[in-house]
A protein has these predicted regions:
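Structural marker of alpha-solenoid helical repeat scaffolds
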Residues: 24, 58-59, 91-95
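Terminal, low-structured helical/coil segments at or just beyond the last alpha-helical repeat
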Residues: 84-130
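Canonical positions in the second alpha-helix
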Residues: 20-21, 54-55, 88-89
């Protein structure tokens, strides 16, 4: 159900279907990865990272989870952490690993722009006479 919704471009319905499947099969790595991929496609990298990390807790050598986590990190602008995932992938399956290709390409691209937060901006104090 989730795959069909995702194939038709309805990521919201896919996420709902995968979340329902997760209640039936809690801890299922394949469902977690599908849910993580769908949430990442929807632009919810933080939520995707959570699902990738739960999948990695269940299967620490899962190449798809390491790749997905790295892609989500790169999309958030955390290229240093994403680079660690690339090194980990290359250690697991060698320099010519097909799984590291999307992550290597994402890291080669320009990093995502940093989000502006209230703490990263300082207001200029302007004092004027009345």
């Amino acid at each position: 159900e989730g795959q069909a919704a995702l194939a038709s471009g309805n990521t919201g319905a896919a996420i709902d279907a995968y979340e329902s499947a997760l209640t039936v099969e809690p801890g299922s790595v394949s469902v977690l990865l599908a849910l993580a991929d769908a949430t990442r496609q929807e632009g919810m990298q933080g939520k995707a990272l959570h699902y990738y990390r739960v999948a990695l807790a269940n299967d620490p050598r899962n190449v798809a989870a390491i790749t997905g986590e790295g892609l989500a990190l790169a999309e958030k602008g955390a290229t240093e952490k994403a680079g660690r995932n690339l090194v980990r992938l290359q250690a697991l399956c060698g320099k010519d690993c097909a799984a590291d290709s999307p992550l290597a390409e994402a890291l080669a691209r320009k990093p995502a722009p940093k989000m502006v937060t209230a703490t990263s901006v300082t207001a200029k104090t302007l004092i004027s006479e009345n």
